[in-house]
Amino acid sequence: MELYTAPPPGSTVICADELGPVIPRTFPPAPGWSGDGHRIKEPLEYSRGPEKTWVYGGLRVADGQAVTLCAPSRNSAFYQEFLQLEEQANPEGTIWVITGNLSSHDSKSTRAWLEDHPRIRHAFIPMRACWLNMQEGWWRIFRRQALAGHEFADPDEIAHATQVATAQLNARARPWIWGRPQPKPRSYRRRFIYTLKERSIKQ
């Protein structure tokens, strides 16, 4: 994972992934409070339906800033639109995109698009190794911020929640560092060792 630990000089490393599909609720809105006084929260549905929404996300490892895009489908066209946003957000240098080897990421259409955008290069993660993608960690934070405990009536509400959560997370973003951080040095208290010496008492 040299792109994480020692990226090429002047380059930008982006971890990219898609979250979803997410669909709005398929039931009438429930009352805000239950009979015993507890707040009612319906879990967000992850399923396939006519109004499903995919969330494209890209994490800039160097400073923790993220770019997101909501789309009604996961295909080459929307992936290229997402890459265009990344290119606009990173106007200088080579952009390394670390992502999974999905068909839309390496389709004929996407490869042709990349020929016209030579600054963007792919580094594909091996199959069954999604844990190598630091975007997965950002998704966990995003789900708690934007989706957990919320109901959405339509895709527009999902897009709005995504936009707000992304802005809030970017406001407090920090660099993402690959691997475990080194433990802090321990501070030891001074140890005072008292040695008792026996004295021979002359009688």
Regions found by a protein language model. Name each.
Residues 1-81, 189, 193-196:
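Extended, low-complexity cationic-aromatic segments
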Residues 100-101, 123-145, 154-158:
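RNase H-like two-metal-ion nuclease catalytic core shared by retroviral integrases
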Residues 14-16, 95-99, 123-126, 177-180:
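Short beta-strand segments
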Residues 18-22, 61-63, 102-104, 128-130, ...:
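Short, solvent-exposed loop/turn segments at secondary-structure junctions
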